[in-house]
Amino acid sequence: MFSANTIHSVFSLFKTDVFSKEVDRFNFGGIFEHLIFNPFEAQIDTGNMMQALLKKAHQNDILILNSQTVTSFQELNNDVEVVTNGITFKTNKLLYTTNGFASQLTNNQVKPARAQVLITKPIPNLDIKGTFHLDKGYFYFRNINDRILFGGGRNLDFEGETTTSHDTTELIQNRLEELLKTVILPHQEFEIEHRWSGTMGVGTHKKPIVEQLSNNVYCGVRMGGMGVAIGSLVGQELADLV
């Protein structure tokens, strides 16, 4: 539940009611009659977002090296020597933005949190439009055109999901399918087309870590599962710090 102070702060920011009680018109199964509606939550096409980011990087003569794993780095006076699985190079400044992969760099202030996901094949006459959260936010689903993207379930196995492995597990994937059948699409047939996972960066605090770690090394990590929403802001703060 939100405290009265939190609700007041949100109202002060948006100058209108952020949450309202709405009747469930989607015919979800096994839930309360009403949903909590937030008109300010939106969808983003992350594919288009990354295309725009790559285009902006190219326009600013920024070189992107793919499939490179940083194995070590060493500060050398005014430079930083970076060693990857493929090459070694020097740079004036090193900025870490690897989020869930930054545990060692931040003395375990950031822990990896795997997020498992699935997406259905196209569903004829799909009526569900929007973004949705359930079970304290541990599950999230949205439509992508006429498909349902559904992810979450980390609370079923916190220890097992504290990993940088990109595997999926039967425990969580089976639960996602079960909720699809019983809650989200109780009256429709569907098929799963893809399953995958990603890595978030979480910690004991929600506030991101934007810090100078040494003379020439900086980090912007611990997005707390909100990387898409706040990543660009954290990037700007990190750039300003340098």
Question: For the regions a protein language model found, what residue spans apply to each?
Answer:
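Flavin-dependent oxidoreductases
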Residues: S72-L149
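C-terminal catalytic lobe of FAD-dependent flavoproteins
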Residues: P186-V242
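Short glycine-/acidic-enriched loop or helix-start segments at secondary-structure transitions
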Residues: L105-N107, G160-E161, I230
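Flavin (FAD/FMN) cofactor-binding and adjacent substrate-gating region
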Residues: M1-A52
